[in-house]
């Protein structure tokens, strides 16, 4: 009898959905699964695989989940039913609570028996080193993540857990008052394409699979780091965590059919060189994961890249904003006001995690919470001035009490000039004496921006 590594003591099962439990036994073995007052029996198929679907559980517990055959069995203790979220992406999602600017104040208070953490950490970080033969062999067998187990939230466990995921989960706990389980499998430096399933890329983006270590669709830094890590390999098919599909195969497929409520995602730094390719990849990513969980409406809330002195980032952030209108059941947390001009890893993570939680509370849980700051809806021109309207624009103001800044306007020639911007009711009026016939407006269009509209 063999179960997914997600099945451990202290696990959280998704409430209010049919509860699929599956595993592997000897062909023909009778398998019994029971939890609370529910029990189901089935027989393992010729390939040993078996699956049962139990009626939904309400939030609560603790329960004991029992899975047995005639010869052997497992008992998982202290199991809760609640809300399960996957927290994924690259290093800013991986960034630990103990590294955050709020660590000293918040770690001692991180005590919650009903917040459970499943922390999938990499066995080998993708640092600037050449990996040895045993590492390279393990990678070829998709053995990239350390074995782990569900743990109660304590100062010790929260300290090494994702800061953004922790603050997201804490806000859900405080608002919903039900158990919350967080699964984190983020990998520093990982590009979007590593998280997409192979069939999707083969059919819809085959060019990115071709000779990936020399492929211009893939960021030069990503290719360079991978080439260094696998330098000692003589295997022309040597695998690496940054390879297209690799993290899907090693970090997402093992979670298949473990019911979750939704996903939070912070990634893009390793794709910011090519926003057009990323737009295509991001849509494939969302669809890939929705297929994996057989849920076309799986909520997917993501972080817009922060502020940093890299020229391509305004284009990338704008592309991420457009995705809000092109994919269903998603939301975007802005982070540019908490950036660091010189560090790709800003330490202020609490507001970002809580902004993701606001999207979940509003859209997934139908709570009366404003999910976002102002989001551009439309514009009209009157008398040489542009009037911008916004979703979530009630009570707009500047974040620092100073005049609005970082607005620019241009005529048809596309030459932008700094503009004056003022809140007028539920609109923002933008104008410049240098631009009598404005055609375009942009806002926060600096790699590191001090834009201040909230």
Regions found by a protein language model. Name each.
Residues 1-454:
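Cell-envelope and extracellular/periplasmic
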């Amino acid at each position: 009898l063999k179960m997914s590594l997600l099945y451990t003591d202290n696990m959280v099962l998704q409430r209010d959905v049919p509860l699929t439990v599956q595993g592997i036994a000897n062909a023909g073995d009778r398998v019994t699964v029971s939890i609370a007052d529910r029990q189901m029996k089935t027989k393992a198929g010729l390939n040993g695989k078996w699956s049962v679907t139990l009626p939904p559980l309400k939030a609560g517990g603790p329960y004991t989940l029992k899975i047995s055959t005639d010869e052997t069995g497992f008992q998982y203790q202290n199991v809760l039913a609640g809300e399960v979220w996957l927290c994924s992406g690259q290093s800013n999602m991986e960034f630990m609570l103990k590294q955050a600017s709020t660590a000293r104040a918040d770690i001692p208070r991180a005590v919650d028996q009903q917040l459970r953490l499943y922390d999938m950490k990499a066995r080998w970080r993708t640092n600037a080193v050449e990996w040895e033969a045993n590492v390279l062999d393990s990678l070829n067998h998709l053995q990239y993540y350390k074995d782990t187990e569900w743990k109660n939230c304590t100062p010790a466990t929260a300290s090494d857990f994702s800061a953004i995921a922790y603050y997201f989960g804490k806000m859900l706990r405080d608002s919903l008052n039900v158990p919350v389980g967080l699964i984190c499998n983020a990998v520093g430096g990982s590009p979007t394409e590593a998280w997409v399933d192979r069939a999707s890329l083969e059919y819809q983006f085959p060019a990115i699979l071709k000779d990936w270590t020399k492929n211009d669709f893939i960021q030069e830094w990503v290719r360079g780091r991978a080439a260094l890590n696998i330098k000692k390999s003589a295997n022309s098919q040597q695998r690496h965590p940054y390879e297209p599909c690799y993290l899907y195969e090693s970090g997402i497929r093992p979670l298949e059919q473990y019911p979750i409520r939704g996903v939070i995602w912070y990634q893009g730094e390793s794709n910011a060189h090519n926003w057009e390719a990323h737009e295509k990849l991001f849509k494939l990513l969302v669809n890939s994961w929705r297929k994996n969980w057989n849920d076309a409406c799986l909520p997917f809330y993501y972080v817009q890249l922060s502020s940093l002195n890299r020229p391509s980032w305004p284009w990338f952030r704008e592309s991420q904003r457009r995705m809000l209108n092109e994919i269903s059941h998603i939301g975007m947390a802005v982070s540019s006001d908490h950036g660091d001009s010189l560090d790709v890893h800003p330490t202020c993570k609490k507001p970002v995690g809580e902004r993701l939680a606001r999207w979940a509370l509003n859209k997934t849980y139908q709570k009366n919470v404003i999910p976002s700051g102002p989001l551009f809806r439309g514009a009209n021109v009157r008398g040489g001035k542009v009037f911008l309207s916004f979703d979530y624009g009630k009570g707009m103001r500047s974040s620092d009490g100073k005049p609005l800044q970082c607005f620019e306007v241009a005529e048809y020639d596309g030459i932008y000039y700094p503009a004056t911007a003022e809140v007028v009711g539920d609109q923002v009026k933008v104008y410049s004496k240098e631009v009598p016939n404005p055609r375009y407006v942009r806002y926060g269009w600096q790699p590191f921006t001090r834009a201040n509209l909230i």
